[in-house]
């Protein structure tokens, strides 16, 4: 086998415990490569959108993972790259249960808009250097424990920043379609068209739509479509001012309600 190279020096990753007070874990979307890193060298990458305000903050990235018992911890690494720059590296040491760690993302590494986030595994076998043994090397990323750690005090407040909405732990973006007033075919068709529009505008990789009352929670979005008199019975429209024609309003998430459009 190839001799392992010494790891570059980064700020030491920290074992993650409970989320810090006031923080929320922004999960990653499902991607083509998936969450399993198999073989000696493997990587998986996500496009991640951050707002201008978020990009200016010190942000951490949390990773939850589990690896095969055949992976040699002393010569195997999991590295995090942001926009093609490696910002952290840790030995792979999670052979019996899922472990989590956090890496500080340096200032100015993230830019307002879409960014590339990549996890790369370099894996060496404990005892076997044969080609067949490489099929025994794998690291599984736990999507429920992986993503950006962001302040709860910075919810999405602009339509332009819809791509910054957080998916759920399975990587899907829940959309709760709310039909105020009478439920008829015309209203349902109208809200389904609006659902398609926000999914395209927000570039949601995996939108999951259901219909019901306004929903709470940290992930996803409520979508309410209807006459102002009906919509106003469900949400506070005072911030919209006088409504004399079609309007789009985004209400930031709060402890009672997820982000609402």
What are these regions (language model features)?
Residues 1-261:
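Solvent-exposed alpha-helical segments and adjacent loops
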């Amino acid at each position: 086998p190839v001799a392992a190279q010494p790891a570059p020096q980064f700020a030491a990753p920290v074992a993650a415990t409970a989320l810090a007070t006031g923080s929320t874990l922004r999960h990653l979307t499902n991607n083509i490569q998936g969450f399993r890193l198999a073989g000696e060298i493997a990587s998986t990458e996500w496009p991640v959108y951050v707002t201008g305000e978020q990009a200016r903050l010190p942000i951490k990235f949390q990773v939850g993972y589990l690896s095969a018992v055949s992976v040699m911890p002393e010569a195997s690494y999991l590295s995090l790259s942001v926009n093609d720059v490696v910002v952290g590296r840790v030995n792979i040491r999670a052979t019996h249960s899922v472990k989590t760690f956090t890496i500080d993302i340096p200032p100015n590494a993230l830019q307002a808009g879409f960014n590339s986030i990549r996890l790369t595994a370099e894996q060496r076998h404990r005892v076997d250097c044969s080609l067949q043994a490489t099929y025994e090397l794998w690291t599984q990323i736990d999507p429920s424990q992986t993503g950006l750690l962001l302040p709860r005090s910075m919810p999405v407040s602009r339509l332009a920043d819809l791509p910054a909405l957080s998916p759920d732990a399975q990587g899907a973006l829940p959309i709760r379609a709310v039909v105020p007033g009478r439920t008829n075919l015309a209203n349902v068709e109208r809200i389904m068209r609006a659902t398609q529009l926000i999914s395209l505008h927000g570039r949601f990789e995996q939108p999951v739509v259901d219909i019901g009352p306004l929903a709470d929670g940290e992930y996803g979005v409520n979508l309410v479509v209807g006459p102002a008199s009906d919509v106003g019975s469900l949400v506070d429209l005072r911030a919209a001012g006088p409504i004399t024609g079609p309007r789009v309003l985004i209400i930031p998430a709060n402890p009672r309600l997820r982000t609402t459009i």
